[in-house]
């Protein structure tokens, strides 16, 4: 686990009080110049940086993440800065954006951003209206920002020097480390989705060879979808950290809105095609569990192994009773494919997999290790066959009924019984190509097994595989 944590350097030049006062004065002059020249809303960004050092690797990271989040927000709002000034000075990081947006609207958005992720607590996002008036939280009947260390009024703690500088710097380091960790997890999920998509040949599925049984998507569609989802998986980890104080049965309702936003982003880049809806659900739960465990100190920097059982157990707790929603689905709500398949066949799909703690994956991981002498992709193809052989894949049933599921499972089982074929990659590839053709002819696609394969790849990445 150690390789997922970064310790940022706090080394830097100490700045004199005179230099800091001069920088503050220059900042005020520049703000007034921009307001006078452009007569529009001004956003000014600085950082919470205690002590004599105002610029180092730690604060560089915090500033970079502030700019990344603001850029993403501007893109989402479809607004472009009239004027932009970025100044990573030794006296402290500064950024200025003159924006064509109502000041009060922007202030509300900045407050939401400040409260959206833990790292944002380190960003000072000041909004001035066209008249040069600084908008504050009290203008919106909101309480002042809280202290990094104790959670009390931040201004009072600063004024009374309640906390030692080292204590505050340690807290900043912790926030940065946790955010960086969340981004590493998001990156690992993205890489797992890409590996799964490119793995070839995969019977009936989109891969690097063909589109399988799909006429509305290809490998590029999957790759673009995975790119769009990467920041959301980071957000799920952060959400897990932020909700660590809640009980497990409250978590699902807390993360559902984020899952819907992820789906919306996916549909936007795929022109309405469902590439990763199941993966959003599964990985969203897993990432949230990881964030929760980190916040509760169950995962520590000195940890060597990533405990898949612990993660899956927590997911099971999050989703306890989830399949009951299928049993008691309200008649007035529009029916979904998952609901119809449960009502007709009793299949619980991805909901059931999550509720049982992804037991299928945990069962197959030892089998993956049995083929340690084989190359990585060869082992993944064998793993996919094992998943297809035993997974009651609702994607398959949706396309081909129970007969289609029986065909997929029986064919996969037959291939796995021939150990010579399984361990000979050339022979296995040829057999999978024939299986692929048969799936395409029957319009069958094991999308559920593909999602479980991606999740397994993700789990394996923590073992150094």
UniProtKB/Swiss-Prot annotation:
MF GO annotations: ATP binding; holo-citrate lyase synthase activity; triphosphoribosyl-dephospho-CoA synthase activity
For the region 2-(5''-triphosphoribosyl)-3'-dephosphocoenzyme-A synthase, give the residue spans: 183-465
Species name for this entry?
Haemophilus influenzae (strain ATCC 51907 / DSM 11121 / KW20 / Rd)
- Any GO BP annotation: prosthetic group biosynthetic process
What is the annotated role of this protein in its UniProt record?
Bifunctional enzyme that catalyzes formation of 2-(5''-triphosphoribosyl)-3'-dephosphocoenzyme-A, and then the transfer of this prosthetic group precursor to the apo-acyl carrier protein (gamma chain) of the citrate lyase to yield the holo-acyl carrier protein.
Catalyses: apo-[citrate lyase ACP] + 2'-(5''-triphospho-alpha-D-ribosyl)-3'-dephospho-CoA = holo-[citrate lyase ACP] + diphosphate; 3'-dephospho-CoA + ATP = 2'-(5''-triphospho-alpha-D-ribosyl)-3'-dephospho-CoA + adenine
Query: What keywords appear on the UniProt entry?
Result: ATP-binding, Multifunctional enzyme, Nucleotide-binding, Nucleotidyltransferase, Transferase
Q: Would you say which domain of life the source belongs to? A: Bacteria
Protein name, per record: Protein CitXG
- Region annotation (Apo-citrate lyase phosphoribosyl-dephospho-CoA transferase) maps to 1-182
């Amino acid at each position: 686990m150690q390789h997922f944590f970064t310790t940022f350097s706090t080394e830097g030049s100490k700045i004199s009080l005179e230099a800091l006062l001069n920088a503050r004065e220059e900042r005020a002059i520049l703000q007034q110049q921009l307001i006078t020249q452009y007569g529009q809303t001004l956003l000014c960004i600085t950082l919470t940086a205690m002590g004599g050092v105002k610029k180092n690797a730690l604060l560089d990271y915090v500033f970079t993440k502030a700019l990344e989040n603001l850029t993403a927000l501007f893109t989402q709002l479809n607004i472009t800065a009239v004027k932009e000034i970025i100044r990573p000075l030794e006296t402290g990081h500064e950024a200025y954006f003159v924006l064509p947006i109502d000041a009060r609207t922007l202030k509300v958005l900045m407050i939401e951003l400040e409260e959206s992720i833990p790292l944002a607590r380190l960003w000072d996002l000041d909004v001035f209206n066209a008249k040069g008036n600084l908008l504050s939280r009290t203008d919106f009947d909101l309480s002042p920002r809280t202290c990094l260390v104790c959670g009390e009024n931040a201004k009072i703690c600063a004024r009374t020097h309640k906390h030692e500088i080292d204590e505050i710097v340690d807290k900043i380091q912790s926030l940065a480390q946790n955010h960086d960790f969340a981004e590493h997890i998001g990156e690992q999920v993205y890489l797992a989705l890409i590996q799964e998509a490119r793995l070839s040949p995969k019977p009936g599925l989109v891969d690097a060879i063909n589109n399988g049984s799909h006429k509305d998507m290809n490998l590029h569609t999957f790759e673009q979808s995975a790119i769009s989802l990467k920041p959301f998986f980071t957000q799920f980890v952060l959400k897990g950290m932020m909700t660590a104080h809640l009980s497990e049965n409250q978590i699902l309702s807390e993360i559902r809105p984020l899952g819907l936003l992820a789906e919306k982003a996916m549909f936007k880049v795929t022109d309405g095609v469902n590439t990763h809806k199941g993966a959003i659900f599964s990985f969203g739960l897993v990432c949230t569990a990881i964030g929760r465990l980190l916040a509760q100190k169950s995962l520590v920097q000195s940890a060597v192994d990533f405990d898949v059982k612990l993660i899956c157990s927590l997911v099971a707790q999050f989703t306890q009773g989830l399949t009951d929603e299928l049993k008691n689905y309200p008649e007035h709500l529009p029916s979904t494919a998952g609901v119809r398949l449960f009502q007709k066949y009793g299949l619980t799909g991805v909901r059931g997999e999550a509720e049982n703690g992804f037991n299928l994956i945990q069962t197959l991981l030892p089998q993956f290790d049995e083929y340690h002498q084989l190359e990585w992709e060869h082992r993944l193809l064998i793993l996919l066959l094992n998943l297809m052989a035993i997974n009651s894949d609702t994607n398959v049933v949706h396309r081909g009924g129970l007969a289609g599921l029986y065909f997929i499972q029986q064919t996969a089982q037959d291939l796995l019984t021939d150990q010579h074929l399984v361990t000979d990659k050339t022979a296995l590839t040829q057999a999978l190509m024939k299986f692929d053709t048969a799936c395409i002819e029957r319009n069958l696609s094991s999308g559920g097994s593909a999602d479980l394969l991606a999740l397994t790849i993700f789990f394996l990445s923590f073992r150094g595989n």
